[in-house]
Amino acid sequence: MPNEFVSVLAAVGTIAVIGLAVKFYNSWRSDKKKKSPILLVEPVVKYSLPLIKKDILSHDTRKFRFALPTSDHILGLPIGQHVHLTVKIGDEVVIRSYTPVSSDDDHGYVDLVIKVYFKNVHPKFPEGGKMSQYLENLKIGETVDFRGPSGRLVYKGHGKFSIKILRKDPPVEYNVKKIVMLAGGTGITPMLQLIRAIIKDSTDETQASLLFANQTEKDILLRDELDDIAKNHPNKLKLWYTIDTSSENWPYSTGFINADMIKDHLFPPSPDTIVLMCGPPPMINFACNPNLDKLGYDPKLRFAY
């Protein structure tokens, strides 16, 4: 038997084995996910989850890990949705919404990255953030009530969005090829949730361009992961930063989001491009929407978390 023929047979055999292995893995992963018990079955039910780990990411940012009921459990949160955390501080019930940075590929726990707003730091908010300071002081083993899924947007993959204009409205389906993302501060978490879903699916050709605004360079949350995704998946993510105060060697933009930043670094308006925004209300109302209007982005193809 000629050597060339033997080589061809060997190559074909190797490809077949790899193909079967990939098929088996995908089937196993799908079956595992189907069999995994889901925590968030009823959106109105509260589930008490214990804190099992806290990582310090920066001077004011923490990653909190809460345990699910068993090591097999998944949270069961659709892409685009968030959870509500409820705590009682004195006589006051405090509720805040967060998007986890973990996903349903993670079993047994849920991770939240949260910026802590300390007392006596911002002159307009001398008391700081009630929920974030409560979580900062939470001890390992103590519990917080989770509720969800919640939210008006769900990403179904391959550029398909299901969005409710108002909370009680029926969802409207959108099919797009590109996503313009405008995020400020902790508003990056729902964007990262969506970006992760897109890059995880090799068949999802949806492209995202992200403009991420912060006060200073050290305030940029999850920067290492964002930079890594942009470097390794340039066909799926275009990334740009802007900060209020910059150093001499800062290679990105400085200042509030403006029309030039959007025009130079994000996808232009088109019928197959949707705009997603998440950040402080002044950013959305005074920096994002007026400049999107100026550049001709369709208001019907915009969504603010």
Indicate where each model-derived feature is located:
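Transmembrane-helix exit/juxtamembrane "anchor" motif
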Residues: 19-39
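Short, compositionally biased
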Residues: 97-108, 156-182, 291
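Gly/Ser/Thr-rich loops at beta-strand to alpha-helix junctions
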Residues: 185-190, 280-283
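Conserved S-adenosyl-L-methionine
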Residues: 176, 200-208
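Aromatic-rich membrane-interfacial microdomains
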Residues: 141, 145-159, 167
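Reductase modules of NAD(P)H-dependent flavoproteins
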Residues: 2-21, 163, 207-305
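Histidine-anchored nucleotide/phosphate-binding helix
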Residues: 100, 188-202
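Ferredoxin-reductase
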Residues: 35-147, 214-216, 244-245
